[in-house]
Regions:
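ATP-dependent carboxylate-amine ligase
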Residues: 1-143
Length: 143
């Protein structure tokens, strides 16, 4: 779903969270928007995606992107009765050098809002809410 579009930038929201869907969506966007920087932000919030034993299924799923971000809210782990997942474990599971991992909603929001999206596509992948992300404010970056 296209959320916003600027002169040379696009913001998309996709409900992808299964590893194969994440990989297919990232690949499709990077192929469709050649010449633009493709940035993907995946929120891990489903029961399976927050399972350390399941995380390796995401290996290479974000490799087609120019920049990849993974976010999970430790509150979601607490609610599901799961232990905190170390940032290093997430990076190792995805197998992507330079992967940005956020576990604090405010830090993620600040990072996304402060970013310059000229000549970029931002693909937000989750059926969650990124810890209460202000979509209106983020969309304004693409006007």
């Amino acid at each position: 779903e296209q959320v916003a579009q600027g002169k040379s930038s696009y913001l998309f929201k996709d409900f992808a969270h299964a590893p194969s869907k994440v990989a297919a969506t990232a690949k499709a966007v990077s192929q469709q928007f050649r010449g633009l920087s493709c940035i993907g932000c995946l929120e891990l919030h489903t029961y399976s995606s927050l399972d350390p034993a399941f995380l390796p299924n995401y290996k290479n799923s974000l490799n087609d992107l120019d920049e990849a971000i993974v976010f999970y809210d430790p509150e979601a782990l607490k609610i599901k009765g799961r232990p905190v997942i170390a940032t290093e474990d997430i990076k190792a599971a995805f197998g992507l050098a330079g992967l940005h991992v956020f576990t604090d909603p405010a830090s993620l929001h600040r990072y996304l809002i402060d970013k310059n999206y000229d000549q970029s596509v931002l693909l937000m992948m989750s059926s969650g809410n990124y810890g209460g992300l202000n979509w209106e404010l983020l969309s304004s970056k693409f006007a």
